């Protein structure tokens, strides 16, 4: 059981890129310990920027983010020790074998007996078997994603940050990724903060959803609560209605509590 009820606190987050491009404009939300929280919104709404700030890879212009009470700007190294991050395009050392990639990545965090245990767990998680002997450059996109995810899960992060985890994957590999994430969330209590354009995936995986438009939260709640509150049959309809309400001058995010 975590001493913290909230795994992630995002408050009044602002990010302005060079040239004055505003990616985030006062974004606030909270992710509870042990839940799967999904950010959804159109391209350019600020989802990836938010995840990169949470993962300590990008500094905000204003506001703050805390992961289990740790400020990601003031204590980035401590925050990173709590986080496992899988970007949409997870890179891999193409000339390494899958096995060598697993060992190298895990050696950046562990050593000795703990390293061997983590390597063994990553191998088991991946389910890649003999394919681990092959160079990563011969892997499909789905195999690379599974390989990278297995490494992140073997690190046993308290918070797993996933940017479009199944984008571009075939049905089989997408199902494998979703199943692994849900398994580790349920069995190991890993909190998940993710983004996705796949609304069916969000409804299957997420305990709560945060809808972002123009760098601000415009709606939040469980998928069922949001659909019921907005009189919608799916999350796409929910988003469209919330966006129209926002453009029509409604103030503040719609909450389905």
Question: Model-predicted segments: where are they?
Answer:
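Conserved ABC transporter NBD signature motif
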Residues: 63-74, 78-79
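Conserved ABC ATPase "signature" region
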Residues: 103, 107-110, 114-131
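Catalytic Walker B motif of ABC-type/P-loop ATPase nucleotide-binding domains
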Residues: 160-164
């Amino acid at each position: 059981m975590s001493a913290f009820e909230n795994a992630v606190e995002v408050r009044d987050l602002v990010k302005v890129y060079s040239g004055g491009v505003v990616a985030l404009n006062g974004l606030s939300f909270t992710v509870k310990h042990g839940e799967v929280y999904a950010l959804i919104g159109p391209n350019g709404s600020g989802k990836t920027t938010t995840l990169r700030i949470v993962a300590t890879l990008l500094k905000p212009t204003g506001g703050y983010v805390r992961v289990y009470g740790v400020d990601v700007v003031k204590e980035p190294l401590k925050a990173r020790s709590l986080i496992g991050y899988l970007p949409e395009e997870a890179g891999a050392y193409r000339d390494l074998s899958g096995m060598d990639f697993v060992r190298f990545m895990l050696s950046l965090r562990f050593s000795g007996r703990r390293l061997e245990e983590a390597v063994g767990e990553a191998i088991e998680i991946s389910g890649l078997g003999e394919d681990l002997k092959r160079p990563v450059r011969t892997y499909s996109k789905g195999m690379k994603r599974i390989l990278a995810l297995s490494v992140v899960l073997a690190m046993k992060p308290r918070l797993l940050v996933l940017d479009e985890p199944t984008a571009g994957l075939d049905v089989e590999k997408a199902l494998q990724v979703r199943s692994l994430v849900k398994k580790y969330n349920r069995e190991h209590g890993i909190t998940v903060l993710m983004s996705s354009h796949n609304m069916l995936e969000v409804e299957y995986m997420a305990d709560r959803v945060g809808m972002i438009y123009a760098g601000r939260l415009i709606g939040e709640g469980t998928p069922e609560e949001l659909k019921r509150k907005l009189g919608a049959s799916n999350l796409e309809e929910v988003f469209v209605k919330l966006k129209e309400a926002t453009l029509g001058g409604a103030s503040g995010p719609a909450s389905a509590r």
